[in-house]
Amino acid sequence: MLIPVLLFIVGLLCLIKGGDWFVDGATGIARRFHVPELLIGATVVSIGTTLPEVMVSTTSALTGHGEIAYGNAIGSVICNSALIAAITIAVRPGKVDPKSLRTPVAFFFVAAAFYAGVAYTTGSFTRPVGLILLAMFVAYIVCNVLAMKNTPAPEEEEQAEEGPFAKELGLLAIGAVLIAVGADLLVDNGTLIAQALGVPESVIALTFVALGTSLPELVTAITSLAKGHGALSLGNVIGANVFNLVLVSGVSVALAPFTIPQNSTIAGMNASLVMDIPVMFAVMLLLTVPALLKGKLSRPQGIALLCIYAAFCVVQFTI
């Protein structure tokens, strides 16, 4: 047990430093190319911080643990929205630009509707489903690139001091590697610790693994807040949620199709269909609707999301 605990701590340290460098590199690139930080957060930063989910879900699917691949994607969306974004909002509520949110939010709900449709109608995620999800990922990237080209940065961003481009790319790349390695150490050794304590695999997937693979987003969000880049944090969370459904699930399903696990029920029905997917929609609606309609996020909103996440975790360990 000592070695897993030590490796768990090493993974956490890698995540913290990796998140710090990744934010520095991403914001430097945003300033250099006059791109709004929220758009950078919704694409470049999201890809880097979603790498752990891609690796964990793909490995799980290939080794016959489809319940982990499935639970990791949904659990990470819930964790990102109701824990990570909630912390960001509760600590530093403020205004957001609704226009910059429309594309990632729209793509998320289109992907989520397709994902839920497959879950409720067949319960089987086949290779064609994975390819459709990957096509959505490509479309999302294209739309964001076009938006970046057509959206000028605010005046203060254009006047910001720029560092060496090679250094910014280096920070971005090294940060992404540290994030991926750190998350891998955290999930592998954290799962060993959880299994030693007798926690079921399905619960591990929706809570522990989801939280572990979402730690890069959490570290990036906290680092962004500390550096005063709240827009980058929110954009990263929403972008990561899109990637969890279209990239993480797309890759794992395309490589190793799986069916929804049936080992947990509520009132005789599949627990995922009764609770997990509805909660995923609920927390994203609570996170995004006020931002789109009012252009701001409030502290009560963040607290409400945190309460939902706490209740979700409690139910997972009691059903």
Where are these regions (language model features)?
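Hydrophobic alpha-helical segments, chiefly the membrane-spanning helices
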Residues: 1-319
